[in-house]
Amino acid sequence: MAKQSYTEKDIQVLEGLEAVRKRPGMYIGSTDSRGLHHLLWEIVDNSIDEALAGEANFIQVTIHKDNSATVTDNGRGIPIGRHKSGRPTPEVVFCTLHAGGKFDASGGYKVSGGLHGVGSAVVNALSSIVEVRIRRDGKEFYQKYEKGGSVIRSPKVINYSGHRTGTEITFKPDPAIFSTTRFDNNIIKERLKESAFLIKGLKIKLDDERHGTSDTFQFKNGIIEFLESKTKGRKSFHDALFFEGTREQISIEVAMQFGSEAYGEDIVSFVNNINTKDGGTHETGFRAGLTRAFNDYARMKEFLKDRDPNLEGSDIREGLTAIINIRIPETILQFEGQTKNKLGTPEAKSALESFVNERVGFFHIFREFRVLSVFSFKVRNTRNEPQEECY
């Protein structure tokens, strides 16, 4: 095999959005269906961030017949003035990597899922067409980008007399990048329903013009309803437990329930409305706090004697269904990778461990009549003793 030459001329510098098109997997994980939907999540998450900031209470997602998608919210709208670079601010956001208002506490968001500032630009880079429409400050701004952002149309700005504000983004994934450009209605419904569960009162509507279907999601009781939807039809030891509070700048919500028949554990966690499918420091802290609370209580009530070893965490969590929903300020937020599947914030471990240990322990002491059967079941199971039937 002939040797290939390697000289100075072989060194390439990929600038701007060209780098995203060259290596899309670095930004969205893959170019299959999962990566395709990741584009939609990037735009939806920007609208979710407006809701997290208390600036939006409605999000509309529309899948068009040509498999383009439109996401609209009634938030503040992306700023439309001139950026210090001399370009329109929306153009900077959609055509420049690492541009946005989510890098520090002085920006427009105290809490958000958009940590890296590449989401909107990545969507532009991997789409054949992107259209941006913004209503803000008595103006309506419109701009169109084509061919992965390589063609930038001049913006149009007109006076707007209405009271409605917000951002509307339409994009069409580039078939030259993706192995499929067909959005899956069921995947989108599941994700939007999750988001509505996580922000009490937020209304999210999904219209799919391909099928002529429309779905609306809104939940006044938040993750309690989320938990109930996951445990519906199952026998359990107790009603759903719900705890909320703040530790180390981190806002925490936990809903949990122990089933009397289920095996294994089902823990679903979210950080700033991002589903952390691979877990992270918050789940580690949750498990540690739960294990400590159970063992402390078991010894206090003498379910465990001095000679007995502690219950193992895996035994305690058997039959557990839990929803963990936390919000972390941008100043300490750390995800492992652009796809944000795993939390890396160190403070989350200690925050969740102390919070869960305290709240679960508090609940045990003051409402123990609801959980005594759980402890009896766990201890008997660990000792391989015969189980009494539980309802």
Region spans (language model):
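Bergerat-fold GHKL ATPase/HATPase_c domain
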Residues: 1-41, 92-94
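GHKL-type ATPase core
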Residues: 2-9, 67-89, 100-229
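Conserved ATP-binding N-box helix of the HATPase_c
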Residues: 34-57, 119-124
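Core mixed alpha/beta domains of very large multi-subunit molecular machines
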Residues: 43-56, 68-74, 78, 384-391
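A conserved short beta-strand within the histidine kinase catalytic ATPase domain
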Residues: 57-63
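GHKL/Histidine-kinase-like ATPase module
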Residues: 153, 186, 193-195, 201, ...
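Extended, well-ordered alpha-helical scaffold/bundle regions in very large, multi-domain proteins
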Residues: 313-379, 383
